[in-house]
Amino acid sequence: MVDAAFGRFDLGRAEDYRHFLLAQARVLLPLEARLATALHLPFRPRGHLLASDLASLDAVVPEPLTVEGLDGEEALLGALYVLEGSRLGGGMLARRVGPDLPRAFLGATHLRGEWRTLLAALDAAGETEAAQAAMVSGARFVFNLYAEAAGRPLAIA
């Protein structure tokens, strides 16, 4: 669903790639700021890489979407799962970026063991049905934000 919303961008074309990065920034930047102040799990932010790529394309960082309502450790873990999951696809998407376009953001793939560490943290935090439901809710919240940012609201329930 979100893949389809972002799949309409031709990453080989500078204008499409710029719009793709602008949509990413509307979600990633405020979400990383929220996670940095509220989550007790280390993660490697990519917002500075995204801002750098945008600057290279003469694009101004856009107005962020609100992440208000994303509360609680488990919901934030669900949100982080979506952000870190996007790193997995980012490395593949980087190959589709035009040769003269910046790709620091998409090229920031996981370091050895990072993904497994996150999955272990999710497993440890998800020992109850309530915790699992909160993680799923946080993930859905972020998927919906990304769909909105891409111009295709989805309302994933």
Predicted regions and their residues:
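Metal- and O2-centered redox machinery and metal/ROS homeostasis
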Residues: 1-157
